A protein has these predicted regions:
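Perimembrane helix-loop-helix junctions
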Residues: 159-185
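Transmembrane-helix signature of polytopic, membrane-embedded enzymes
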Residues: 79-99, 117
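Membrane-lumen/periplasm interface segments of specific transmembrane helices
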Residues: 23, 179-195
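N-terminal membrane topogenic signal
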Residues: 1-18, 85
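Membrane-interface alpha helices of multi-pass inner-membrane proteins
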Residues: 138-152
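Aromatic- and kink-enriched transmembrane "portal" helix at the membrane-lumen/periplasm boundary
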Residues: 57, 93-113
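Membrane-interface transmembrane helices that cradle and orient dolichyl/undecaprenyl
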Residues: 122-137
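Transmembrane-helix motifs of polytopic, lipid-linked glycan transferases
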Residues: 66-82
Length: 195
């Protein structure tokens, strides 16, 4: 049964995911050691996570691994709940590990891991809100997470354009669209107020 990659139990999928993440961090360390650091794109809140990473490198690496693990677990659990596969499997968890560790290109892995965690949380909240009528709190939280992403990681600004598309595709009401828009804009107001 060990050769069947689709039907691996949760502990095996979790172990595979953690091995992929550790290999990605070793690859990033070797690449940075010999080729130099690839600078990250600057963002208002990304500056603080980059400063934390420089001050506490081991703690930020551990926090990054934990954030990637939580995001992978959320993605794996969501794929089981949404019945994406014909059989109950946790294949999405190692696949998320491969994709997410391919994204970790710059030296600012803490910011990118936090961005992936926010994206997984936003996806989970959107998924839960679209299966219920008038679920304003989850719509707001999902949009709030998406609104935080460009403040942490500037290339994530394109995700803000997906909110109106998602609201239209899932035929949400105008009230839910206003809640989603206010959730996405609220972090920008706070960042503008602080800076």
């Amino acid at each position: 049964k060990f050769g069947d990659i689709i039907r691996q139990p949760l502990p095996v999928a979790t172990f595979t995911f953690l091995v992929i993440v550790i290999i990605a961090f070793v690859r990033a360390w070797v690449t940075q050691r010999f080729a130099g650091e690839i600078p990250a794109v600057s963002a208002p809140l990304g500056y603080y996570t980059a400063a934390f990473r420089l001050s506490w490198p081991l703690l930020s690496a551990a926090a990054s691994i934990v954030m990637l693990f939580v995001a992978g677990f959320l993605i794996g659990r969501s794929s089981v709940r949404a019945e994406l596969y014909a059989t109950r499997c946790f294949l999405a968890m190692p696949l998320f590990g491969v994709v997410s560790c391919g994204v970790l290109l710059s030296s600012d892995f803490l910011t990118q891991s936090l961005t992936l965690l926010l994206l997984a949380l936003a996806s989970r909240n959107y998924y839960n809100s679209f299966h219920r009528h008038y679920c304003f709190d989850r719509m707001f939280r999902g949009s709030l997470y998406v609104g935080l992403i460009p403040l942490l990681y500037a290339p994530g600004a394109g995700l803000l354009l997906l909110i109106p598309l998602v609201v239209l595709l899932f035929r949400r009401t105008l009230r839910e669209a206003v809640v989603a828009l206010s959730g996405a804009i609220l972090p920008l107001f706070f960042a503008g107020f602080i800076h």
